[in-house]
Design a protein with these regions (language model features):
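Residue-level signature of catalytic and energy-coupling elements of molecular machines
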Residues: 10, 54, 74, 100, ...
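Short beta-strand-to-loop acidic/aromatic patch adjacent to the donor-nucleotide binding site
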Residues: 1-12
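Active-site loop/turn elements of alpha/beta-hydrolase fold enzymes
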Residues: 9-11, 35, 112
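Catalytic donor-sugar/metal-binding loop of nucleotide-sugar-dependent glycosyltransferases
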Residues: 88, 97-115
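C-terminal, non-catalytic tails of nucleotide-sugar-dependent glycosyltransferases
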Residues: 136-151
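Acceptor/aglycone-binding surface of glycosyltransferases and processive sugar-polymer synthases
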Residues: 3, 15-90, 117-138
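DNA-recognition element of transcription regulators
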Residues: 94
Length: 151
């Protein structure tokens, strides 16, 4: 296959919207989704908005939703970006998108409908874990920034 499709399996993404990514694939190296009318708890939205502010300060990346796991990536782009040890375990896509932009890849954003979670509960972003996750990801942002500056 020439492309890799990444999509969460919690029912918040509508697989019928994959065609939007497929139709846009020739316009960019990575096609990434952003949530229209995000259907998450308020604390998740707040945490994400704050993280996006910090992220855009560090990387000067202008993505609407850099953490969203609904993407279509060309195989050669994926292979060129897979050789790094993630610095942000709960923020993989934040890091992946920053590395793609720093390598000069073009990213196209596609708005997608976002639904309430159908299956399971979040294991990562539980309220009691947010301070620890914020600290780990902040340190991860520093590591990624340093790594990108030294290459």
């Amino acid at each position: 296959a020439d492309y890799l499709l990444i999509m969460d399996s919690d029912g918040q993404c509508d697989p019928r919207q994959i065609f939007k990514f497929w139709n846009a694939r020739k316009k960019a190296d990575l096609v990434v989704g952003y949530r229209i009318k995000r259907r998450d708890f308020l604390y998740r939205k707040f945490f994400s908005d704050f993280a996006k502010l910090v992220y855009s300060f560090f990387f000067k990346v202008k993505l609407k939703d850099p953490s969203f796991a609904f993407s279509l990536i060309r195989k050669d782009v994926y292979k060129s970006l897979q050789n790094f040890t993630p610095s942000m375990p709960e923020g993989f896509f934040w890091e992946y998108n920053a590395r793609a932009i720093y390598k000069g890849y073009k990213i196209l954003e596609i708005g997608i409908n976002h639904k309430k979670r159908k299956y399971g509960d979040t294991q990562i972003f539980q309220v009691w874990r947010l301070p620890k996750i914020a600290l780990i990801n902040f340190i991860g942002l520093l590591r990624v920034k340093f790594d990108l500056l030294t290459k």
